[in-house]
């Protein structure tokens, strides 16, 4: 203890005088004490003035001490005075220990500031004797901090208690008073010692090894303050001014923590402690708080009438802090609140349970009602379904009747194009498209493309051709790669047409039977009606005969002989003659409902397909005959006249300028390039049956003559393509709508396979998907063999070559390894397409119409590479002007455009004019 006191005295001696005089005034008071520091500049010896508390009966007994540093002393006296001071402190502690309260702590380990003289027993002699020794100590250490505390304790209780309190304060040393509270207050602080030991450590920066749980708050506070002062003095001995501030600040913080945390179970930081102290002062400034604490069983010594004295912050804070039941009150309040919450929760749970039960009951009722409603609805739905089924059956029957009447008046597309239907299981693809169908005339909407509904198949988007992997196979299409289950040129995926033609082949036999039944019934009705007419006529004749006989009997017998023989056969011959034309007229129940197509001799335009299509073995020498020879045996194109000049079969014919092997008759009057009838160029890729998917041109009669509009050889397809299936309609009448196959002869395809045939010429624009050459405004006459089907509008070639250029540009982007390479003589670029994904070229083909005129000179290649150079597309004036130019006969005529005389146009019958299908 002596060594510690010596160290602390030496360390604290390094603090300057002025620092003590300025900063120590700011020390925070303890709960029951006020620190008064006075500095006297005089060099007189230090006088310790203490008022004896025994004789003082006043409300407060302040003890004022003033420590004045002496001016001159010796070091020997300093040491002697220090030891004597320590001895007197220990002796006084031993004296005061039995009389102090049981809670008075042990001797201090490190007294805070032994700089100041001790507060001793009422004998002031010891203090006066120790003053000069203390003066010597202060002389050696030039600075001292003298602190003197006067615990202001208002006394209004009996004098004995006051005497006890004052005696306790006397017995305690002057600086140890910081570590203790009055003995009466220690009783209330014992409960909080454990918490305070931990809470005070937060503000101290030194070792806080205060494990004395029995010590009071002052004890802990002094230890901490001493440690802080020691460390700060050691570390900061050079900075004297800062040391003063550090000491005082540490004292302030620790004192505040001690008082604030005395009753708090939760640790408080020094910043929050000071804030709470201020807030608590404001909360507890009312005098009612002291009265409530007095009535709560606190010791009366602690709750004296301290409001009568001058209140300090420590009084308010300690008074509020040391309510021992505050924590219990808070617990009681919390428990009460928890009970209230529990009650509320229980009530809520009960209410929820009730609500759930009610809801369950309601739900059960609702479910029962819903089940009943569902049962009723199911019954109603079943009834409605039955009604709907009945209605659907009726509607289907009506639709079947309407379809038979409406949709099947024109020739069915499966037999026009002879490509597989969805129900045909992939049929034969080698059958030429031999017939014309009126749905396919326009380039819009009804363009007969593939069935797939991808956006690239829209009619306005031009398609790049899908070049088949086998360019010389017989079953290739100009538009799609051969897939055996695809409808090539049938109607597009329009619901109305699908509904009309999906179940066509299934219904076809039924339709034939119904048609035959209807025809038979009509024949029977006609026969019955004719019989009735005959009976009526016979009765009339008999009556007339009787009358005539009566008259003739009166007249001469010669007149009777002369009049009677002609009269009976004449009425009999009339019904025979009237009935005979009616029977064939009644058989075609379905006729093409187009104003431009009329019956020709009542049998020519019957839509019932002939059992002998143009490639049937019955017509081996004329596969391209538009008219069957059975109907008009006197036609100049009958097989009996195979080598007639009207049927040019010479192989030299394709070399004629009328037959450029590029099928482009640029000035042909039969194809306006942008007319709605304009379709697509044929597939001339060569090999067998390269015309499989081309459209047909019906015959055009001129008077009684039938023109063969095809100039290719007769025997070109009689062997290559198989005979198509027999058409579904009545085999009694052969249709006059026969195709004009637009292909060169296979001989030419073999010889010129290098130049033009090898290039897959597949049109791309939506305008040339299908060429229907039957829409020519003025078909050629029968006498000219060279106005034949092989002229194709030059615009086809423009489109195809522009597509070549576009494909060449696009394939730089579409670096597709699967694209097949072909060389097209009509353009200087490689014609690259991909079977899989070359359709990306479609996007650039929309500009083909603008580029047509730029590529005219490179587009027309005849078989012998004779280029027909045309500068522009034929206009309507050109097309109409060529109608009046004479034509030349012969296979090698020099004219490059088909000529059409006006005589034939003027001499055409009205029925044949209606068959021109002009626009």
Curated annotation (Swiss-Prot):
Signal peptide: none annotated. Residues 1-15, 34-75, 96-107, 141-153, 186-292, 450-471, 553-564, 573-589, 618-635, 712-723, 798-863 have a biased composition (Low complexity). It comes from Dictyostelium discoideum (Social amoeba). Residues 154-167, 785-797 have a biased composition (Basic and acidic residues). Residues 16-25, 420-433, 678-695, 754-768, 883-899 have a biased composition (Polar residues). Residues 1-167, 179-312, 415-491, 553-739, 751-863, 883-906 are annotated as: Disordered. This is Putative uncharacterized protein DDB_G0291608.
């Amino acid at each position: 203890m002596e060594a510690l006191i010596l160290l602390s005295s030496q360390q604290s001696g390094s603090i300057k005088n002025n620092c003590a005089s300025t900063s120590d005034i700011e020390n925070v008071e303890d709960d029951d004490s006020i620190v008064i520091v006075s500095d006297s500049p005089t060099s007189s010896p230090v006088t310790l003035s203490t008022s004896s508390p025994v004789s003082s009966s006043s409300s407060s007994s302040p003890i004022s001490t003033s420590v004045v540093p002496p001016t001159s002393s010796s070091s020997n006296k300093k040491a002697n005075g220090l030891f004597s001071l320590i001895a007197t402190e220990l002796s006084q502690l031993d004296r005061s220990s039995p009389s102090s309260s049981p809670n008075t702590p042990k001797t201090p380990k490190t007294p805070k500031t032994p700089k100041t003289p001790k507060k001793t027993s009422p004998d002031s002699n010891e203090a006066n004797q120790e003053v000069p020794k203390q003066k010597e100590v202060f002389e050696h250490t030039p600075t001292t901090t003298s602190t003197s505390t006067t615990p202001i304790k208002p006394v209004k209780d009996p004098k004995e208690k006051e005497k006890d309190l004052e005696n306790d304060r006397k017995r305690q040393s002057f600086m140890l008073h910081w570590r203790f509270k009055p003995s009466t207050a220690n009783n209330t602080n014992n409960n909080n010692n454990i918490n305070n030991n931990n809470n005070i450590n937060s503000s101290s920066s030194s070792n806080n090894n205060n494990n004395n749980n029995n010590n009071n708050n002052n004890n802990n506070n002094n230890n901490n303050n001493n440690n802080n002062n020691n460390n700060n003095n050691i570390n900061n001995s050079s900075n004297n001014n800062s040391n003063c501030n550090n000491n005082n600040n540490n004292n302030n913080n620790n004192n505040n923590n001690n008082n604030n945390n005395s009753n708090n179970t939760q640790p408080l930081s020094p910043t929050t402690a000071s804030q709470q102290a201020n807030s608590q002062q404001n909360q507890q400034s009312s005098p009612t708080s002291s009265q409530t604490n007095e009535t709560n069983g606190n010791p009366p010594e602690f709750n004296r009438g301290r409001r009568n004295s001058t209140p300090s912050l420590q009084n308010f804070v300690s008074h509020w802090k040391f309510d021992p039941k505050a924590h219990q009150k808070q617990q009681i309040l919390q428990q009460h609140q928890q009970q209230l919450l529990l009650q509320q929760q229980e009530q809520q749970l009960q209410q929820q349970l009730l609500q759930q039960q009610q809801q369950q009951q309601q739900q059960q009722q609702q479910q029962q009602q819903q089940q009943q409603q569902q049962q009723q609805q199911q019954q109603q739905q079943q009834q409605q379904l039955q009604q709907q089924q009945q209605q659907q059956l009726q509607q289907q029957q009506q639709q079947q009747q309407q379809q038979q009447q409406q949709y099947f008046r024109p020739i069915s597309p499966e037999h026009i194009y002879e490509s597989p239907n969805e129900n045909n299981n992939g049929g034969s693809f080698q059958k030429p498209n031999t017939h014309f169908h009126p749905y396919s005339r326009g380039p819009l909407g009804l363009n007969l493309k593939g069935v797939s509904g991808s956006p690239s198949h829209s009619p306005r988007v031009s398609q790049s051709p899908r070049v088949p992997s086998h360019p010389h196979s017989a079953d290739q299409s100009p538009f799609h790669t051969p897939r055996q289950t695809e409808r090539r040129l049938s109607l597009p995926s329009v619901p109305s047409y699908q509904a009309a033609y999906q179940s066509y082949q299934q219904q076809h036999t039924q339709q034939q039977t119904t048609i035959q039944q209807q025809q038979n019934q009509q024949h029977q009705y006609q026969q019955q009606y004719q019989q009735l007419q005959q009976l009526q006529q016979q009765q009339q004749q008999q009556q007339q005969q009787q009358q005539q006989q009566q008259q003739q009997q009166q007249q001469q017998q010669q007149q009777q002989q002369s009049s009677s023989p002609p009269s009976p056969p004449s009425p009999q011959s009339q019904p025979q003659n009237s009935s005979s034309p009616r029977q064939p007229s009644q058989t075609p129940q379905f006729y093409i409902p187009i104003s431009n197509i009329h019956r020709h001799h009542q049998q020519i335009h019957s839509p019932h397909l002939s059992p002998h299509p143009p490639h049937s073995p019955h017509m081996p020498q004329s596969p391209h005959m538009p008219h069957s020879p059975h109907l008009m045996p006197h036609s100049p194109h009958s097989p009996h006249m195979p080598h007639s000049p009207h049927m040019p079969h010479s192989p030299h014919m394709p070399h004629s300028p009328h037959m450029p092997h590029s099928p482009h008759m640029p000035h042909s009057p039969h194809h306006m390039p942008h007319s709605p009838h304009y379709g697509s160029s044929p597939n001339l890729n060569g090999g067998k049956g390269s015309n499989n998917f081309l459209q047909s041109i019906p015959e055009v009669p001129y008077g009684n003559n039938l023109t063969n509009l095809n100039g290719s050889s007769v025997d070109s397809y009689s062997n290559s393509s198989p005979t198509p299936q027999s058409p579904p309609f009545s085999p009694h009448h052969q249709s006059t709508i026969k195709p004009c196959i637009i292909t060169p002869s296979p001989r030419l395809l073999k010889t010129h396979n290098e130049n033009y045939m090898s290039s897959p010429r597949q049109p791309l624009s939506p305008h040339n998907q299908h060429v229907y050459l039957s829409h020519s405004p003025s078909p050629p006459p029968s006498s000219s063999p060279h106005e034949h089907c092989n002229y194709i509008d030059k615009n086809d070639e423009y489109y195809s070559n522009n597509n070549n250029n576009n494909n060449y540009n696009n394939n730089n982007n579409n670096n597709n390894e699967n694209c097949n390479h072909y060389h097209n003589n009509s353009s200087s670029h490689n014609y690259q397409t991909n079977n899989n994904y070359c359709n990306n070229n479609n996007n650039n083909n929309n500009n083909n119409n603008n580029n047509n005129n730029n590529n005219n000179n490179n587009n027309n290649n005849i078989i012998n590479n004779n280029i027909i150079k045309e500068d522009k597309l034929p206009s309507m004036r050109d097309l109409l002007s060529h109608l009046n130019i004479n034509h030349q006969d012969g296979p090698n005529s020099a004219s490059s455009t088909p000529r059409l005389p006006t005589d034939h146009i003027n001499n055409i019958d009205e029925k044949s004019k209606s068959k021109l299908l002009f626009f």
